[in-house]
């Protein structure tokens, strides 16, 4: 991703063009200060808080700091008092050389919000340097025939000071032949020329010695001197002349040492030794020059490395002197060409290494870029990788702010490595990269999420207490305490469930435990909700449904409903002697409280006095005859029936049945009972049974009447008041209800018990069947 004035397919780039800088500078006024150089450290430059219109404490709270743009750090900020202090003594000449004015540019950076203030500090020059000549002695060879008014150039003195503190005047010691004049170059530097006032006579005075003095304009002025020794030579009437008065050349700054810069050429019309010309580097502007000249050929070559960023332009004077002392001069102007030899520099001013997720636009870093090259070599493009939720914003004058483009999500990416790439536009391009690591700090923005919306757990009944029946699990993509989950049981919708006595949960890992043994016959299944809550602030939670299904174990034996079993005597059924094969004697009705295959019942005839006469249907418990009865068959038979389920382990119940063979229902043949009972005791038992039966029938009848009346009253009340009326519904186990309405016996008999005072054997009297005999035979 890139922020740019122009976009490429690869990157969005931000290009600071000159026009953008000009527009910014036009709209931003810098705060300027001025002070003389060589001021002692600790000097109070200004009260910065007052000048910026800020409260004193605001500089500290907003993290105020100074950005020096790569310059020497001469200033320090007392943020508590708001004072801008001098850190060390400044030397204008070391800072700016001959550049005027000497201005130190720096920025004041504030955070929360980010603000920039351009500030300039100008150092004024003081006269702290003496003029100094490059040589302690200068030698001039002047022919004795030189005419008055002839001018002889002299080497200028150097003074690092500028303006009026630089060299302003030259004087020469009193003499009869010469005076000195002070002239100015195009850069306003002063240089001396020696003017002949009176003709020389070698024979009279072959050599003269003068003292040349250079004076600056300080108060008081400072001076420097050198000795000018003049040798008077014989006549030489032609001075050397250069072919060009000005040589202008361009040299790339990366030229190697000893590279040829330019060749100057001068000629002398004299013959012989007076026509021989020697070249010398006579005058350079402002200090040592990285050039050397061959005195014979006039070739000017590099003797030191060039640096466009340090000095981009050189001017020097070349003197051609013949053996007679006559000379000529020319000017060589050398323009150093910039090459792209400096990679951009990136300076981090402010860096935030941790950003909270879901935060709006946040400042990650503030940095500046610089490139001392010129032109396209110094123009820069700043970019970051594509696909990152960050933007580069140009804030001011080569400053960028790295901000978040949108709220971050720590769960998607907890760390970003942002590579800032700064490239110049030179050929070839030079690039600097800097990587910033940003950590995304977590906030509690994710609720725990269960791995399933609902859980179904299976547990066998009769389990041991504290049995682990299953585990629910939730995850939270937050970190730290925001991602720690606490599990809990939520209050059930059915308050009668008693969940707290059935189930417990481990709050740390979500394991569920059955607190007590479960009974399938009492509770086949139940549901409840579990909650998962994190430890964030505020805490977030979610819930899931848990359904516990109790699996049936074969823990109940079949229970025989009919015939009723008596511990003292088995149930007695009657069999007509004329019964056809397949005659239904009775039907064994049994139930099993278990479910599934544990409740699948089968019937079996275990033992009979006449095994070939009777059979039991395995699936419905019907006891039938298998053949016709004969006279040889006994009048009484005992049958032992077995009712068993299909569970594991198999459980069963036995039924003892006594069958009496009778010739007819009106005159049954009843043998004496095997055990003689006390008649009084038998009468008491029969009476008790009759009372119980009568009470049961009466209760059922009364209950039915009450229920019928209640239903009618509820219907009338609902119709009258248009209000809801709920009728309680009884719960009857499905395996105890005869859905077909046919019952378990296919024949209905009416029994009448006849008790007489002289009935010693308490015989039963059987009435005719309620159902016609023809129907019985059809069945």
From Swiss-Prot:
SMART domains to which the protein is assigned, alphabetical: CA
UniProt keyword terms in alphabetical order: Calcium, Cell adhesion, Cell membrane, Disulfide bond, Glycoprotein, Membrane, Metal-binding, Repeat, Signal, Transmembrane, Transmembrane helix
Cell location: Cell membrane
All residue ranges annotated as the Cadherin domain in the record: 75-133, 134-242, 243-346, 347-450, 451-560, 575-675
Glycosylation sites: 169, 223, 225, 227, 417, 566
Gene Ontology molecular function: any one: identical protein binding
Membrane-side (Extracellular) residue stretches: 29-690
Function summary: Calcium-dependent cell-adhesion protein involved in cells self-recognition and non-self discrimination. Thereby, it is involved in the establishment and maintenance of specific neuronal connections in the brain.
Subunit structure: Forms homodimers in trans (molecules expressed by two different cells). Forms promiscuous heterodimers in cis (at the plasma membrane of the same cell) with other protocadherins.
Written domain comment of the UniProt record: Cadherin 1 to cadherin 4 domains mediate homophilic trans-interaction, the interaction with an identical protocadherin expressed by a neighboring cell. This is a head-to-tail interaction, the cadherin 1 domain interacting with the cadherin 4 domain and the cadherin 2 domain interacting the cadherin 3 domain of the other protocadherin. The cadherin 6 domain mediates promiscuous interactions with protocadherins on the same cell membrane. Each cadherin domain binds three calcium ions.
Protein name per the record: Protocadherin beta-8
Organism: Mus musculus
Gene that encodes it: Pcdhb8
